[in-house]
């Protein structure tokens, strides 16, 4: 094999890795050894299902199960015309380093972009909740949703829009720690979505947290306070 042919085959392989696209739900098994697994191809879910399901070994923690979404990769939950759009990424007990774009699927109610519990999320690019399409009574999806989550945000997290209903929250759940150096915004709608909505929250904000726009603007921060 001559040199020019070897270079041509190498470039073809690289372009295939970057540009190839999966359709339908994909499951990735993380290794639990603290070494990151990388997603280098875009993934789109179908029929309101998740795009990417995360599986982890038993008796491991989120610091040992690491997933990286690489630059120029798009992960989007499946669209549903009658129900909730699918999550972009769903899982429990893992770390997500996002350098691409993650979207919840559009639906009667928009899907959540990243959904699960016991997650550390480092967001270096964009996370979008899915758009709600159902009209009155429907809602956009949250950018991030779950319990026991740590969010390090350096770029943008958006709740999904719903022109006839309520915008989704940027981040929602309980027992959530947020370090924000970028923007966290609720989705737009008849009622604007909250920037952050939940209970037992610890927030350090160095940039912007904003509710979405609507006839009634969403709250920058909505807290549920329970008496002890």
What are these regions (language model features)?
Residues 17-27:
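Boundary at the C-terminal end of the N-terminal hydrophobic targeting segment
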Residues 34-45, 54, 62, 67-71, ...:
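All-beta strand scaffolds that present successive hydrophobic residues in beta-strands
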Residues 8-19:
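Bacterial N-terminal signal peptides
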Residues 1-7:
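Positively charged n-region of N-terminal signal peptides that target proteins for export
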Residues 45-51, 59, 73-88, 99-113, ...:
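Glycine-centered low-complexity coil/loop motifs and glycine-rich tracts
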